[in-house]
Amino acid sequence: MKKLCMTAMLLLAAAPVFGATPPASNAHKPHVAQAALAARQELPRFRFENFTTANGLPDNHVYSVLVDGDRIWAGTENGLAVYENHAWKIYNTKDGLAHRAVLSLALDKRTGDVWAGTMAGLSRTSGGRIDTFTQLNSGLSNDVVYGVSVDGEDVWVATAAGACRLNLKTGQWALYNERNTPMNEIWVYGVSATPTKVYLAVWGSGLLEFDQKTGRWDKYDDPDGENEMVLFKDQGLIHEIVTSVSFVDNIVWAATYFGGSRYDGRYWHNFLTKDCGLPSNFINTIKGVDANRAWFGTDKGLAYYDGVNWAVYRPSLTTGKPEMTERDAQGKVTPVAVTTAPAHNYVLGIDFQGSDIWVATAKGLSHGIRQP
């Protein structure tokens, strides 16, 4: 069944919980205490400018977005696009790009190189030159690259057949799959690498943690197994199908197609539409800001969580008109008058540029300009 699901996803896209867990009623109290200040902050408001093929994008289906100083990179269905000085430059297979469909992007802050995960290999853009890595010419585990993350001299890659790591100093590749890690399935949808920990988002196999110092792998599962009903809400990872992961300030933010999770190394706190401000449990991507704040990209809009309150930004699901709503800790939802919204409700990528936000959607790229 999972293989059938995976095939569908490719077409559309081009064990126990670790550590002791307290009762659900207490599991998120430390998180609430840390987030007390967030309750007094106004939720961000934006004026959205949208980019489509009408104003320079090579394709309206945008899988990923990356902020690189004043440059904005967009991975689309039909090439890699970079926006600089109010103009777009497009890279495609004729320029050396591995494949026209660019699923993921990462920046090497040391060198300025941009890494692009595609449907047929991994490409590096460096000073206008593109080098491509595939199963045939490198140690890449699979040519379908869902995620990429750079940590110092290491490039971590999430693929349809496990994960791998390229050491840029030695040129050596290391492969990680069901043979040398606890993953039950090998479809790795996302990776978040830092000097201390690396996290893998695995389709059907939960969340994997790699300790950079000890070389040890740990695995975090949904205590409900593959049951779509949530029996133990804050007892562990919300679901086995993990689509995205973000590790920031020693906090893990995980996205699944059945809700979201936050983990501080001891306590879990899960997010479901029935008891929070998420517009949908179907989460494509997640981007942590810090220990308390995160952005969620769902199939029904862009959502922001400040540790207590929620905001949702989207075209209305019924009228298509720009819409923003705010939800407080008591569950009160308040509409906010706005005149702009992200290009589409189906959000696939998120990145930040100062106080602004860039959003990759199924129908265009959006720039949210923070308003006072």
Task: Say what each PLM segment does.
Residues G19-P372:
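Carboxylate-rich, polar loop motifs that coordinate divalent cations or form catalytic acidic clusters
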Residues L4-A13:
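Sec-dependent N-terminal signal peptides
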